[in-house]
């Protein structure tokens, strides 16, 4: 018998206005990616999606650029949108939007080409996500996002960004599972434009442990005590996230951690279509999250960013071309999130 598929969201004008506002907000799109989203996508739970909207702004202190005697000021923006479109206990459709941006004020130039440094770098993506539970207990699905990552997004097809993943979750006992997947991206740090297979094992012996380890990623969540959580994730080749958090009071969470991350953008009017402008940085940070409503939170944090640099090339081997080194320095960050 064909199952009826129930809609879980009404696309009301207010929510769509918020969504479009993030895209049009001073050309400042961003992108929030959380470790919890990895766990959700590969988890055995289906049909529990909620509408989600997060936005984060991170201004950095003005710093010097090595060898150019120029100042560099940057504010980083992130946002994440998820709209469940239809779901039941065995099937779910959702729409995912990710937005990332750097608002930049500087007179720095790219040293090899002598071009002025972009005053903004934006990454805007949107696409569907699908998951289904089959009669044998397997879960299969995937997602596809299409967008543009550039100083001038959507200026031409040369700035188009495409990411796609297909996966299967194969149960191994009551709580554990194998995960096999195939991913493609034209804006990946390594093996760019290459369909990349992967395999991992989901190990969850209790509610205190969740380990997803394999190729090409690893994710670990551990709760040694009721109010203490530890998280770690790794993505090849230079993306690391580690965090420890403590539930101080019921609505208050304090945390600290380390991030090593990177971003890539297709500059408009670049000479080589395979080149991207890369940004790398490491962060140490601490913060507090206040769940002021059951479905809303406010997050304030501060930290120190170091090993910050940009370069232009096809991959990390080109890291000395058009390289711009930004001095280490502090930053602050504010994030708000809503669940409906």
Tell where the protein language model's regions lie, with residue ranges.
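Cleavable N-terminal export/targeting peptides
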Residues: 1-50, 311, 316, 340
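Transmembrane beta-barrel domains of bacterial outer-membrane proteins
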Residues: 35-173, 265, 273-285, 316
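Outer-membrane beta-barrel "beta-signal"
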Residues: 198-202, 286-296, 302, 323-340
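Residue-level signature of outer-membrane beta-barrel architecture
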Residues: 83-85, 130-132, 168-170, 184, ...
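Structural signature of outer-membrane beta-barrel domains
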Residues: 58-62, 98-104, 147-151, 185-189, ...
């Amino acid at each position: 018998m064909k199952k009826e598929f129930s809609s879980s969201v009404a696309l009301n004008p207010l929510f769509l206005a918020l969504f479009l506002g993030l895209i049009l907000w001073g050309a400042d799109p961003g992108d929030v990616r959380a470790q919890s989203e990895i766990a959700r996508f590969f988890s055995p739970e289906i049909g529990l999606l909620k509408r989600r909207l997060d936005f984060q702004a991170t201004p950095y202190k003005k710093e010097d650029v090595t060898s150019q005697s120029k100042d560099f000021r940057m504010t980083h923006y992130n946002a994440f949108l998820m709209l469940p479109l239809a779901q039941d206990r065995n099937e779910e459709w959702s729409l995912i939007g990710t937005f990332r941006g750097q608002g930049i004020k500087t007179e720095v130039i790219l040293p090899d080409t002598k071009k002025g440094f972009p005053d903004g770098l934006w990454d805007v993506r949107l696409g569907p996500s699908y998951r289904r539970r089959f009669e044998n207990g397997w879960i299969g699905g995937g997602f596809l996002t299409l967008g543009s990552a550039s100083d001038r997004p959507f200026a031409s097809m040369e700035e188009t960004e495409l990411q796609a993943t297909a996966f299967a979750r194969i149960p191994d006992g009551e709580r554990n599972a194998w995960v096999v997947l195939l991913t493609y991206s034209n804006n990946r740090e390594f093996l760019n434009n290459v369909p990349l297979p992967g395999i991992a094992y989901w190990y969850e012996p209790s509610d205190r442990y969740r380990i997803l380890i394999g190729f090409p990623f690893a994710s670990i969540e551990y709760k040694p005590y009721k109010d203490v959580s530890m998280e770690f994730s790794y993505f090849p080749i230079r993306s690391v996230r580690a965090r420890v958090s403590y539930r101080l009071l019921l609505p208050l969470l304090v945390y600290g951690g380390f991030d090593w991350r990177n971003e890539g953008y297709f500059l408009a009017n670049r000479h080589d279509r395979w080149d991207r402008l890369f940004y790398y940085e490491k962060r140490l940070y601490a913060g507090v999250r206040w769940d002021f409503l059951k479905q809303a939170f406010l997050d304030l944090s501060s930290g120190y960013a170091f090993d910050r640099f940009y370069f232009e090339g096809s991959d990390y081997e080109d890291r000395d071309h058009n390289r711009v080194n930004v001095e280490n320095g502090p930053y602050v960050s504010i994030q708000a999130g809503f669940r409906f």
